[in-house]
Amino acid sequence: MNGTEGENFYVPMSNKTGVVRSPFDYPQYYLGEPWMFSALAAYMFFLILTGLPVNFLTLFVTIQHKKLRQPLNYILLNLAVSDLFMVFGGFTTTIITSMNGYFIFGPAGCNFEGFFATLGGEVGLWCLVVLAIERYMVVCKPMANFRFGSQHAIIGVVFTWIMALSCAGPPLVGWSRYIPEGLQCSCGVDYYTMKPEVNNESFVIYMFVVHFTIPLIVIFFCYGRLVCTVKEAAAQQQESESTQRAEREVTRMVIIMVVAFLICWVPYASVAFYIFINQGCDFTPFFMTVPAFFAKSSAVYNPLIYILMNKQFRNCMITTICLGKNPFEEEESTSASASKTEASSVSSSQVAPA
């Protein structure tokens, strides 16, 4: 084995030289230069500095403006809540451990950080699945006269938390475990060892199939069908200017959604899966550190993509920030009135987010 396994940790370095120490008790500067740990702390500070206000503002604006309290926005609010879970439960812990060079909070703190980071990430992931299904049902209309109402939204929110807990909870009760990873300053599921005492192998397989592969398939299917439906609608309307514009907007939004998902999660999942199927392989701490920390950036990507691209929400946010006045409202209202007739056929199909 090219790593050193302890009771509740796995350091990706052989202990032949005798320098490896528990990441709960000693700084891990033998894994990297001190400035590298400082860089991680600075990165986490950036995510907190951006993710906290954007997600909090999302909640505040939606509560303040009644017209935003639509069923679809329940899912978007839930997405913001999940991002805040990652910020408060994961990022704040990681910034402190990175500044100290090791996981100073011990195994209990590792469970805390790993649980909330995983929970927030999984709620966010399953929110994307619910959004994809909602778009598919509304735009592609596989069920005639389907309307996405408050009851559907509440069911969707509950579903995201049930699925997230079914992924983040088991390591706390003996099915797999949370251990420090990469430079040993953040915690995640143990992909590094089989650990038969906690049936680690079966949990990792379950996690990859149920909590990564299936969501990815659902998202690709739903948005793939959505793009096809929009193109068919455009062809039937002789590709009018408004329809072409709507098609471009929806296509751009879908591409950004899918690409953001892939950028955030595929590198982390791919590296984790590689390590899992190549137990004991030789890899540097950065091999897991970079994708693990990059996946955390989803807490910033999510509100930017799913909230800030929502025109209605954007107008309400500007109004809130500008203390009740929107300096762009007059210009936008003039533009909207000019295209109201053309856009009615598109909005009736609910092609764009509510």
Swiss-Prot record:
Q: Sites of glycosylation?
A: 2, 15
Q: Which residues cross the membrane?
A: 37-61, 74-96, 111-133, 153-173, 203-224, 253-274, 287-308
**Protein name per the record:** Rhodopsin
Its biological function?
Photoreceptor required for image-forming vision at low light intensity. While most salt water fish species use retinal as chromophore, most freshwater fish use 3-dehydroretinal, or a mixture of retinal and 3-dehydroretinal. Light-induced isomerization of 11-cis to all-trans retinal triggers a conformational change that activates signaling via G-proteins. Subsequent receptor phosphorylation mediates displacement of the bound G-protein alpha subunit by arrestin and terminates signaling.
- UniProt PTM: Phosphorylated on some or all of the serine and threonine residues present in the C-terminal region. Contains one covalently linked retinal chromophore.
Q: Provide the lipid-modification sites (S-palmitoyl cysteine).
A: 322
Report the superkingdom from the record.
Eukaryota
Compositionally skewed regions (Low complexity) per UniProt: 334-354
Main subcellular location of this protein, as a coarse class: membrane
Q: Where found in the cell?
A: Membrane; Cell projection, Cilium, Photoreceptor outer segment
PANTHER family from the UniProt entry: OPSIN
Give residue numbers for the modification (N6-(retinylidene)lysine). 296
Q: Which Gene3D superfamilies does this entry report, sorted A to Z?
A: Rhodopsin 7-helix transmembrane proteins
Q: Which family does it belong to?
A: Belongs to the G-protein coupled receptor 1 family. Opsin subfamily.
Site (Plays an important role in the conformation switch to the active conformation) at 113
Bilayer topology reads: Multi-pass membrane protein
